[in-house]
Amino acid sequence: MIQRPATLPTLSILAFTLILAGCGAGTDLAQRPPPGYVGDVAARVSAVDWAQARPVTVQLDEFRFQPDRLAFERGTPYRLTLENRGNVAHTFTSEGFFKAIAVRRVTTAQGAVETPALVNLEIPAGQTDVVEFIPVEAGTYDLACHEPLHSSFGMTGAITVR
């Protein structure tokens, strides 16, 4: 049996596959708000009755958020449940929205993190994450999944804070 060296197209496909495999965004939480984020988070979240938090659920699956349009009211506490019903990991990413909210807690399969600043939230296939937050700044913000090609295939949405 004669072995042939790998061809350029084969190597290119292999390299592209490895690049995509390494591009998963992962969950990124900052313990201190980066520049541009809402400040005084601890005081904001401690002043709220979390028993009154409004529940909102978003389902993520292959190339869609359901619902893909979300609306929140400033100063109202929310418990956002993100259910990944897909077969692959998805992210819930909205840089502008993350900068405009005070986060009390993020709960993932690994446990809970108190008062983080969200940078990116990745939900593995079949798992559920919960974000408890208060919207602080009004605006309309883009929402997208930042896994490779997901937003290109329509996994986008919008978040409005009134």
Q: Can you say where each PLM-predicted feature lies in the sequence?
A:
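Bacterial N-terminal signal peptides that target proteins for export
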Residues: I2-S12
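C-terminal motif of bacterial Sec signal peptides marking the signal peptidase cleavage site
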Residues: I19-G22
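Extracellular/periplasmic metallocenter environments
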Residues: G24-G39, R64, T115-R162
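N-terminal low-complexity, Pro/Thr/Ser-rich intrinsically disordered segments
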Residues: L29-V56
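N-terminal edge beta-strand
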Residues: A47-Y78
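Beta-strand cores of secreted/periplasmic/IMS beta-sandwich domains, seen most often
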Residues: D68-T93, T128-E137, V161
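Short aromatic-acidic-glycine turn motif
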Residues: F98-A109
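Short beta-strand and strand-turn-strand segments in soluble, beta-rich domains
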Residues: T108-P116
